[in-house]
From Swiss-Prot:
Disulfide bond entries: none
Pathway: Cofactor biosynthesis; biotin biosynthesis; biotin from 7,8-diaminononanoate: step 2/2
Listed SMART domains: BATS, Elp3
GO molecular function: 2 iron, 2 sulfur cluster binding; 4 iron, 4 sulfur cluster binding; biotin synthase activity; iron ion binding
Organism name: Agrobacterium fabrum (strain C58 / ATCC 33970)
Name of the protein described by the UniProt record: Biotin synthase
Names of required cofactors: [4Fe-4S] cluster; [2Fe-2S] cluster
The reaction(s) this protein catalyses: (4R,5S)-dethiobiotin + (sulfur carrier)-SH + 2 reduced [2Fe-2S]-[ferredoxin] + 2 S-adenosyl-L-methionine = (sulfur carrier)-H + biotin + 2 5'-deoxyadenosine + 2 L-methionine + 2 oxidized [2Fe-2S]-[ferredoxin]
HAMAP family tied to this protein: BioB
PANTHER family associated with the record: BIOTIN SYNTHASE (PTHR22976), BIOTIN SYNTHASE, MITOCHONDRIAL (PTHR22976:SF2)
Record bears the keyword Metal-binding: yes
Cofactor binding: number and manner: Binds 1 [4Fe-4S] cluster. The cluster is coordinated with 3 cysteines and an exchangeable S-adenosyl-L-methionine. Binds 1 [2Fe-2S] cluster. The cluster is coordinated with 3 cysteines and 1 arginine.
Length: 339
């Protein structure tokens, strides 16, 4: 890590693979490097493990919307936030699979299914398992986000062939209780451990723009990087202020700060896919381009992201053409060694 923070006469130091644990102080030094140096180093690390011009394409479907009992301050789906969102029942399996087929036709290689639950009930597990098995039969990667999981539920999803489980930590441990009180930071880490122990890959990241400090953002990434095995996928979301939610009037995130966070995620977790997730509709094409330069190599495609707007596929296709980017093929979605 010391090599990464070394700078001599403005010239960047050599870039070792960052495979060891990271401290908050080391991460702060890296984050605060001159912007050009930070992006240069992040791009070097990125090219060491991935095709720098390939972007992994995922599609996210809400299979059960609204009515969640949690009190997450940012969320349109919390029953405690008067956002006007109507709750729905769990979607039928065949409808989910029909949407998955459309996603594959649109270029997605990973299909993510999200349910607004505190945790899945046993009565719903059979349908959830059938969804995983059905999507796997389409030769797509599968991901689910269903709330907290027990070890037994994790094992059942693993047996069905689930590739990834998403469970974000959202923010730093210090700031966490300012955003959510109905489950603890440790609860989230426990679910991540259950998923990992079952052999499912982990997808875990957070949200920027909830009133946290820059140090909170850095701390969140250090927590993820220092898990026994870092997440294979790290979604970085920009808050979408939802009318009726507690964060409806939150101040926007500075785009340069957002790009710095992407770069730090890439350097601290060099083998992870760093996903430019919610909030892309609020980003300029130039900001997104800087994020890709900083090491982001995954996006959600489609016009909606759970209940939020997302750039349309035509816009993403045009942006990729302008930047010379290409969809990542399924067989190349694993990180390679330093080349």
């Amino acid at each position: 890590m010391d090599q990464l923070a070394t700078q001599i006469d403005g010239k960047p130091a050599s870039i070792p693979a960052v495979e060891t644990s990271s401290s908050l102080e080391e991460a702060k030094i890296i984050y605060n490097l001159p912007f050009n140096d930070l992006l240069f180093r992040a791009q070097q690390v990125h090219r060491c493990h991935f095709d720098a011009n390939a972007i992994q394409m995922s599609r996210l479907l809400s299979i059960k919307t609204g009515g969640c009992p949690e009190d997450c301050s940012y969320c349109s789906q919390s029953a405690r936030n008067p956002t006007g969102l109507k709750a729905s029942k769990l979607m039928e399996v065949e409808r989910v699979l029909a949407e998955a087929r459309k996603a594959k036709e649109g270029g997605a290689t990973r299909y993510c299914m999200g349910a607004a639950w505190r945790n899945p009930k046993e009565r719903d597990m059979e349908a959830v398992v059938a969804m995983v098995e059905g999507v796997k039969a389409l030769d797509m990667e599968t991901c689910m986000t269903l709330g907290m999981l027990t070890p037994e539920q994790s094992e059942r999803l693993a047996d069905a062939g689930l590739d990834y489980y998403n469970h974000n930590v959202d923010t730093s441990e210090r700031f966490y209780s300012e955003i959510i009180t109905t489950r603890t930071f440790e609860d989230r880490l426990e679910t991540l451990a259950n998923v990992r122990d079952a052999g499912i890959k982990v997808c875990a990241g957070g949200i920027l723009g909830m009133g946290e400090t820059v140090e909170d953002r850095i701390s969140m990434l250090v927590t993820l990087a220092n898990l026994p095995v870092p997440p294979e996928s790290v979604p970085i979301n920009m808050l979408i202020p939802i009318p009726g939610s507690k964060l409806a009037n939150a101040d926007p995130v500075d785009p340069i700060d957002f790009v710095r966070t992407i770069a730090l995620a890439r350097i601290l977790m060099p083998r992870s896919h760093v996903r430019l997730s919610a909030g892309r509709t609020e980003m300029s094409d130039e900001t997104q381009a800087l994020c890709f330069l900083a090491g982001a190599n995954s996006i959600f495609i489609g016009e909606t992201l759970l209940t939020a707007d997302n750039p349309g596929e035509d816009h993403d296709t045009a942006l990729f053409r302008r930047l010379g980017l290409k969809p990542m093929e399924l067989q190349s979605s694993e990180a390679g060694g330093c080349r």
